[in-house]
Structures are given as structure tokens and as C-alpha cells.
């Protein structure tokens, strides 16, 4: 049974600044206000990262705006928009990620937040920082692809 996937937020800088080796799908523990804000697209992954703590994975610095509605939910309580949120993965995946993060230069980045069916999910990836010359090479390759695509259009 295929569930409809609706992408809400992408972390484009992560794919440019880091080399992503493995990706995982993780559930996110959210409050009612937060899931409503995510469905409206009020989420930013710009500075977000994942850190293992006590055998669990936690998502840091993901900005989910407070949901504004006619009636205040949670009795008017305003949540911290950048609070840490627990990620739900299989134990074996958590242990695998934790052991790889202990290696030099590896980190876990949040790449995407999306809705699968009716559930909010996060795509996280094991990443290693790129050097400046790798970034320049990526830019050159992107420009070359764009130029060849435009050249082919003009040719037709």
C-alpha cells in the first residue's frame, strides 16, 4: 500500500555543505500544535542537526512556528519553537548511527521533513563535511549541466 508523501521542508544547505552517505527515515515526537504548524509549512531545517543521547536520537534547532488559531490550544501555552525533539528509529539503526558518529568527522543531519500518510517523518543522513574545493567542483558541475541543457534547447 503506497502512502502519499508530501514534502514540507528541505535542508538544501546540508546537501551542499556535506557529503551524505546513508539516509534513514525517522518518526518525530510532536505536540498537536507542532503537527498543525508543519502541515501549514511553518518549519525550517536551516540550522538543524541530530545528536545521540542515552540510546536515543534527538533533533536540535529545528524551528517549528507556534500554531496560531482562533482558540489557543494547550491552554494558551506557547512552546519553544526550537526545542529538541525525539526521533523514532529502530534500536539497531540508532546503535549503527551512534557508532559511526564516534568516527572522526561524521555527523547526522536532518535533510527533509515530510508527511507520509498522516504522519510527520524526518529524513536524516550520515554526513561528512565537504572541503572548499569539493564545493567549487559541485558548483562547476551544476553550471556545466545547466549550460549543456540550455545548449540542447537552442539546438532544437
Model segments located where?
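Ribosome-associated RNA-binding proteins
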Residues: 1-156
